[in-house]
Amino acid sequence: MTAILHAMLGKGLGGLEQVFLDYQPILEAWAARRGGICAGVVRGGGAVAKAQSGRTPPLLSMPAHTDWDPLTLGAARRIVRAVKPAIILSHGQRPARLFEKAAPKSARLAICVHKPVFDIETTRTDYICVGRHLAELAVERGVPASRVHFVPNAVKIPTVLAQPFADPGRPPRIVAAGRLHPKKGFDVLVAAAALLRDRGLSFEVEIAGEGDERGKLEGLIAEHGLGDRVRLVGWRDASAFLATGDLFAFPSYQEGFPLVLLEAMAVGLPVAASAIPGPDEMIVEGASGRLLPPGDAAALADALADLIADPAAAVGFGRKARADVLADYGPDSLARRLSAVVDEIANRA
């Protein structure tokens, strides 16, 4: 019997949390084929614990204070004693450090790397990286290549698709989504919208999400006189919201392998995104979307203006983007890749 302990202690319901939820049934199925279990562990009182309260099998929960907090470390040790895991797979640094302290030496350790900031332990830990750039970084930092694995994120294939530029009676709608945080670059999108307005283009922008940057963004929208064109609409169901758009803007500064970009591609939206590690693995410039320098409002405005001016080309980008997601980034692809990696970790002598 092979037991897996699968841990994620994020408090929100963003990309990291969604990847954990995507992994959990795959790991449960993998363990069940070997007569074992996969125990999912989340932060007590966090968004995932609340959203998954009726799940079968249930997720375990624990406190998530500091790495050395006696209550938190004690909970990790109790969970390890109860589950007796052969493999511990963690999302993020905190659960990785906690369960490394709590785990017996016989346990195989793995961490899913979502961003280019992570601890390195070269003798015992496998690194499951959601982007090729993250896998390359792990090897550069000294992790043996045999312990580094590339498993790109995936999305459920939506049944409702965008219909870009299908309604000539309304202005083109540019949509964006994500946590309202400086690294997401939504201030760049607001500045690009001001440039588009000054060029006399008709359009509207809707940004879905919440976060600490809301007040600043509201101020920028007012400062540029864009209140009638740019709206912050709060959190929305991602696929349904994205399907209302004609174009998707992704002006981020730093990413792993962003789910919301995959979701936009999956509904068939033409995309204008920052040419940064992660997105540049997902989009082929001039074939499945547009890539442009991060932080460059003029370049973003130019790309969006070009797409608006040539709807046929934009629609073609969206179709190619969706085809790429269907081919490489659906649930079946994730299950196959992740299961193969867990096989390798479990079978290593």
How would you label these PLM feature ranges?
Residues 68-72, 90-96, 113:
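Short His-centered aromatic/hydrophobic patch
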Residues 40-41, 270-273, 283:
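Short hydrophobic beta-strand element within catalytic cores of glycosyltransferases
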Residues 133, 154:
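Carbohydrate-associated surface elements
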Residues 213-216, 226-235, 241, 290-291:
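Active-site donor-binding acidic/aromatic loop of nucleotide-activated sugar
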